[in-house]
Amino acid sequence: MFSKSMTIEQVDPDLWRAIQGEVQRQEDHIELIASENYASPAVLQAQGTVLTNKYAEGYPGKRYYGGCKHVDIVEQLAIDRLRALFNAEYVNVQPHSGSQANAAVYLSALKPGDTLLGMSLAHGGHLTHGAPVNMSGKIFNSIAYGLDPETEEIDYTELEQLAHEHKPRMIVAGASSYARVIDWQAFRKIADNVGAYLFVDMAHYAGLIAAGYYPNPVGIADFVTSSTHKTLRGPRGGVIMAKPEHEKALNSAVFPQTQGGPLMHVIAAKAVAFKEAASPAFKDYQKQVIENARVMARVLQQRGLRIVSGHTDCHMFLVDLRAKNLTGREAETALETAHITVNKNAIPNDPQKPFVTSGVRIGTPAITTRGFKELESEQLANLVADVLEAPTNEAVLDQVAREAQALCAKFPVYGN
């Protein structure tokens, strides 16, 4: 029999120290990685419940195990809330990640060798959109579209030309480092003209979409997937939304074709996050996320840095570091020393290797969760610029670290 009084610290002190180190890092470092956020205490609590003990292969009302009365309620809550949040018809909340949700979509609608038209990884796409190193680029005939070299926005003319030339079975829209509004209707029109499915991966934009600050692709695309962290601020996981005629194929693609038992504790945490995302406070939060990103981009431009495409419409943007004779890897290392966390990121047509890069990606979901507004975002952008101007100056790095820690202390992630 277990005692509820037993703690991780008592059972596994080595693991406890690692966890506490990460707790401290999250509290005293400013997080600017666009794909990261802080889950609420309620989301964390749901994910740490006894629901982790329950196997529930199948779907609510049709399980392969007994004892699923309560987990059926949990999963149905998540389903109903997700459906309402995005005005979806069919939803599946079981994918363990956004990438697995994408794999299930491909498995449900494509055959090996079918042509897939997705955004180039080098221009801001995602690995799972047909990159050669990913299974989506190995199993399917992957063709990539990209950005207009002048505007650094999606080149819809090229997209249409490629679609007519290659006649893809599926066109993928969505990105991992694209700061502008994506025209879902333009994608729909092109897909219809060549008889292709339209699949949207909205993982980065889901929270903004839920709040009404970014166009909703649900109902336009045949398939929509998302991760549940990032701007949606839930647990790490994935979801699928689609037109109802794809329900049977998608359910089968998730279980039993790509997954076994669903993670019921994670689905519970998703349900909490979906409820939080339907609140007025969440709408206000997403508005602030965009405002903070725009402030940071503007200040960095004023400090002599180039922002890819010149502007942002969402929670993130790319900074071109070539004018500073600095690589993304060098910038990432210097900023981390100064208690500011970013990720190195390729810019369009980047001459550097993927582990080096010529840019960094900056996102504001996490700092906005802390409570940063325009004033703090302006201060932070200037701190980032200070580091990028003197990445090896220890005095500058120490001063920026002190100011960053002061901001963190003023805006703790998890208060008392």
UniProtKB/Swiss-Prot annotation:
Keywords: Amino-acid biosynthesis, Cytoplasm, One-carbon metabolism, Pyridoxal phosphate, Transferase. (6S)-5,6,7,8-tetrahydrofolate binds at residues 121, 125-127. GO terms for molecular function: glycine hydroxymethyltransferase activity; pyridoxal phosphate binding. Its cofactor is pyridoxal 5'-phosphate. One of its GO terms (cellular component) is cytosol. Pathway: One-carbon metabolism; tetrahydrofolate interconversion; Amino-acid biosynthesis; glycine biosynthesis; glycine from L-serine: step 1/1. Its main location: cytoplasm. The keyword Ribosomal protein does not apply. SUPFAM superfamilies: PLP-dependent transferases. It catalyses: (6R)-5,10-methylene-5,6,7,8-tetrahydrofolate + glycine + H2O = (6S)-5,6,7,8-tetrahydrofolate + L-serine. The record marks 229 as: Plays an important role in substrate specificity. The modification N6-(pyridoxal phosphate)lysine is found at residue 230. Its EC number is 2.1.2.1. GO terms for biological process: glycine biosynthetic process from serine; tetrahydrofolate interconversion. It is found in: Cytoplasm. Belongs to the SHMT family. Homodimer. NCBIfam families: PRK00011.1. Catalyzes the reversible interconversion of serine and glycine with tetrahydrofolate (THF) serving as the one-carbon carrier. This reaction serves as the major source of one-carbon groups required for the biosynthesis of purines, thymidylate, methionine, and other important biomolecules. Also exhibits THF-independent aldolase activity toward beta-hydroxyamino acids, producing glycine and aldehydes, via a retro-aldol mechanism. This is Serine hydroxymethyltransferase.
